[in-house]
C-alpha cells in the first residue's frame, strides 16, 4: 500500500509532507547533504534520527557567531528533508552549552550577532521535525535557550541551568521569550534576576524537563528509549501536533478552522492515516514509520 504526499489544503511550513527516501544506516552525513563536521559541530544520521553534537568542549560548546549560523543552516536544511524525522541536540565534554562566546568581540557586530541568535532559535522553534535536547552537562545563558526551545528535553542529574548574564551587565535578550514560555513568568524572572543555578530535578517536577538520568550512561539509555518511542510516531502527524500546539500557544487566528483543515487532510485518501488505520485493522498496532513500505514511494 502506498500513499501520496500531495496535500489537499495549503498548510504552513510546520506541516511538511510525509518523509520518504529512508536511510537505514548510521553514518556521518555526506557532503552532498550537509558538512558532517564543522567548526564546532558534528552531525550523525541513523535511520530517521539526526544527531547534532556541539563539539567545542575547550570553550564549553559556546555559541560563536559562525557556529550559530551553521546550526541555523543545519536546522533549516533538516526541516526540509523527508528522511529526517527527529533531531537530537547534545554537547561534547563537560558542558551542554555555555552560551554566547564571550571571547568574541560583542560590540562591533552587536546587531549581526543578535540577528544570528534570533535566526537560530527561530529555526529550531519553527522546525517541523521533533527536536530533542539531550542535556549532558551545565547550560548557561543561550545554552539554556538551546535546550528549552526544543520540544523534548532530557538531562543528566549533574547538569544545571544558569541565566548568568545579569552578573556581566547583560540579560538573556534573545532567549528570554523561550525561557518565560517554558518555565513560566515567576521562575524565569527569578532565574534571570538572581543568576541562580536551577537544578534539573526542580524542572522535572514542573514538567518542563521530561526525564532526569542519574549519570551519563543512564542518559544514553533514557535517550535511546525516547527515540525508540518516537520511532512509532508518524512524521506528518507529529508535525501537525507541533503546529496545533503553536497555534494554541500563540492564540492567533481561528484555531477551529485550522484544526478542521488538518483533520480533513489527515483522513484524506493517500494520507498517513490511511496506511496506519489499515495496519491497525490487520492487528498491527505499532508501526515503525522509517521502515513502513508506504514511505518509500511518493
From Swiss-Prot:
Its EC number is 4.2.1.-. Enoyl-CoA hydratase; part of the gene clusters that mediate the biosynthesis of the host-selective toxins (HSTs) AF-toxins responsible for Alternaria black spot of strawberry disease by the strawberry pathotype. AF-toxin I and III are valine derivatives of 2,3-dyhydroxy-isovaleric acid and 2-hydroxy-isovaleric acid respectively, while AF II is an isoleucine derivative of 2-hydroxy-valeric acid. These derivatives are bound to a 9,10-epoxy-8-hydroxy-9-methyl-decatrienoic acid (EDA) moiety. Pfam families: ECH_1 (PF00378). Pathway: Mycotoxin biosynthesis. Gene3D superfamilies: 2-enoyl-CoA Hydratase, Chain A, domain 1. Keywords: Lyase, Virulence. Gene clusters encoding host-selective toxins (HSTs) are localized on conditionally dispensable chromosomes (CDCs), also called supernumerary chromosomes, where they are present in multiple copies. The CDCs are not essential for saprophytic growth but controls host-selective pathogenicity. The keyword Lyase applies. Residues 1-39 are annotated as: Disordered. InterPro entries: ClpP/crotonase-like_dom_sf, Enoyl-CoA_hydra/iso, Enoyl-CoA_Hydratase/Isomerase. The keyword Lyase applies. Belongs to the enoyl-CoA hydratase/isomerase family. CDD domains: crotonase-like. One of its GO terms (molecular function) is enoyl-CoA hydratase activity. SUPFAM superfamilies: ClpP/crotonase. It comes from Alternaria alternata. It is an enzyme of class 4 (lyase). Signal peptide: none annotated. It comes from the Eukaryota. It catalyses: a (3S)-3-hydroxyacyl-CoA = a (2E)-enoyl-CoA + H2O; a 4-saturated-(3S)-3-hydroxyacyl-CoA = a (3E)-enoyl-CoA + H2O. This is Enoyl-CoA hydratase AFT6-1.
Amino acid at each position: 500500500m502506498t500513499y501520496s504526499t500531495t496535500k489537499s489544503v495549503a498548510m504552513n511550513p510546520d506541516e511538511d509532507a510525509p518523509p520518504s527516501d529512508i536511510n537505514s544506516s548510521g553514518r556521518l552525513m555526506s557532503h552532498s547533504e550537509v558538512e558532517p563536521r564543522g567548526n564546532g559541530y558534528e552531525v550523525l544520521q541513523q535511520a530517521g534520527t539526526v544527531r547534532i553534537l556541539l563539539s567545542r568542549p575547550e570553550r564549553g560548546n559556546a555559541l560563536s557567531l559562525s557556529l550559530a549560523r551553521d546550526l541555523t543552516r543545519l536546522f533549516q536544511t533538516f526541516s526540509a528533508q523527508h528522511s529526517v524525522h527527529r533531531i537530537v541536540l547534545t554537547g561534547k565534554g563537560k558542558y551542554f552549552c555555555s552560551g554566547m562566546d564571550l571571547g568574541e568581540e560583542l560590540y562591533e557586530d552587536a546587531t549581526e550577532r543578535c540577528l544570528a541568535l534570533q535566526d537560530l532559535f527561530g529555526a529550531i522553534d519553527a522546525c517541523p521535525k521533533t527536536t530533542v535536547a539531550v542535556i549532558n552537562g551545565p547550560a548557561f545563558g543561550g545554552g539554556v535557550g538551546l535546550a528549552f526551545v526544543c520540544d523534548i528535553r532530557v538531562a543528566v542529574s549533574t547538569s544545571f541551568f544558569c541565566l548568568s548574564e545579569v552578573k556581566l551587565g547583560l540579560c538573556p535578550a534573545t532567549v528570554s521569550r523561550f525561557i518565560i514560555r517554558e518555565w513560566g513568568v515567576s521562575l524565569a524572572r527569578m532565574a534571570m534576576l538572581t543568576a541562580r543555578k536551577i537544578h534539573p530535578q526542580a524542572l522535572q517536577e514542573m514538567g518542563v524537563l521530561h526525564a532526569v538520568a542519574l549519570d551519563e550512561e543512564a542518559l544514553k539509555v533514557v535517550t535511546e528509549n525516547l527515540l525508540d518511542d518516537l520511532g512509532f510516531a508518524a512524521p506528518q502527524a507529529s508535525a501537525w501536533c507541533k503546529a496545533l500546539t503553536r497555534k494554541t500557544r500563540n492564540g492567533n487566528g481561528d484555531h477551529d478552522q485550522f484544526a478542521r483543515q488538518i483533520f480533513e487532510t489527515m483522513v484524506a485518501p493517500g494520507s498517513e492515516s490511511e496506511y496506519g488505520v489499515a495496519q491497525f485493522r490487520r492487528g498491527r498496532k505499532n508501526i515503525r514509520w522509517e521502515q513502513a513500505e508506504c514511505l518509500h514511494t511518493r
